[in-house]
Amino acid sequence: MTIGLVLGCAPMTLAQIDPYTRSLLQLGYDQSLSSQGPQSLYAYYYYNNPGLLRTNVALRLAVAPVYFDGEIGFRQLLSPHTDVGIGINGGGYGENYYEVRQGHYFKGESFDGHGGGVSLNLYHLINPAQLIPLNAVVQGGAHYSVYSATDKTDDQFNLPDDHVRTFARAGLRFGGKEPMLYPDLALEVSVWFERQWRLEDGSYGFAADRRAQPTTDLYWLYAGLNYAWTNTGNQFTFALTAGGSENADRLNAWRLGGVLPLAAEFPLTLPGYYYKEISAQRFVHLSAAYVAPLSADHRWQLRLGAASAYVDYLPGFERPGRWHTGAGPDLSFTSRSQVWRVILRYGYGFNALRDGRDGAHSVGLLYQYNFERRKHRHEKAKRTFNAD
């Protein structure tokens, strides 16, 4: 089980300095009911202050019990439409590796990962006169990773060497999505390329039977839409992600599976599957959901969602069939004040392989608490009381 999983898996980068004040608590848990697989969990506090110290300085923090990710942003530093951010992240258990092949979780070949890094981020707004922003994003940095055995790691299994990884990423992002649990409105189309360099590559495993590659290229396209009819309580979401890689290895290949929506910058969910069950070189991932109200005030909602992916497996992780599909319902309840929200969910993986047969079940829990919304409600109530 990993606390701070969401922070260790991917930096929570945005296409621009976040202009809104935010104070959120996010919790998520996903548990397989079919065999024993990796348990996925995140628990973190998200804070964003767009006006720290001076009007052009912003602070973003995501803090978990044993991991943190942050950025100090400087709006309009290089030009009226170019922002600069300095990112830092680090802590424990954010880079754990889980070996899953043919639907079986190999604990003896899995291990814990820890580390930290820094980055320099540039965000340039290309179309300042338009309502929906188009941003060019350029990022670069370094990350140090260390690995340790769990109490289940095989004594004969040699861990990867501790190493420094540098990276450079460039992308174009049209629109964007708030760092919230299922936001009502969101529109994003983005394309990305990232190159990674390991300063110390090498072999590991049983008698050096696997290797960490010195360089890896990752590229992907994302298109997503969230739209809610607030007068009826209905909502529709859709997302398409297509990605590929060159010279990827176990430690940086594309991983698909699980249902936690905030467990990665670009989550590749598959209901009913283990977290990161599928290892792929290339993939196309589709997801969609429809939300219907169960009460007149729309506080109770039923969400029906599904996800499907076509994958080109990482060598050594092949399995029958290239399509993977999962689906399931969620039951959502929002407090009368709209300060907190809890979601219970169930997922069934149609093509998840368990004991030689297809089909797997999972359950999950999601929770969000919005401190900023509570603050605004208290201030509004205080003003109303004083006016009376």
Where are these regions (language model features)?
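Bacterial N-terminal signal peptides
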Residues: 1-10
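Outer-membrane beta-barrel initiation region
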Residues: 13-97, 166-184, 280, 294-298, ...
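Transmembrane beta-strand segments of outer-membrane beta-barrel domains in Gram-negative
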Residues: 21-25, 32, 36, 86-237, ...
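Residue-level signature of outer-membrane beta-barrel architecture
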Residues: 47-49, 72-76, 120-126, 172-176, ...
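Extracytoplasmic gating/loop element in the C-terminal half of outer-membrane beta-barrel translocons
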Residues: 232-314
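Short glycine-rich, acidic/polar surface loops and turns
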Residues: 287-289, 317, 326-333
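Conserved active-site loop/cleft motifs that coordinate metal ions or position small ligands
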Residues: 301-305, 340-348
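Outer-membrane beta-barrel "beta-signal"
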Residues: 331-335, 340-342, 357-388
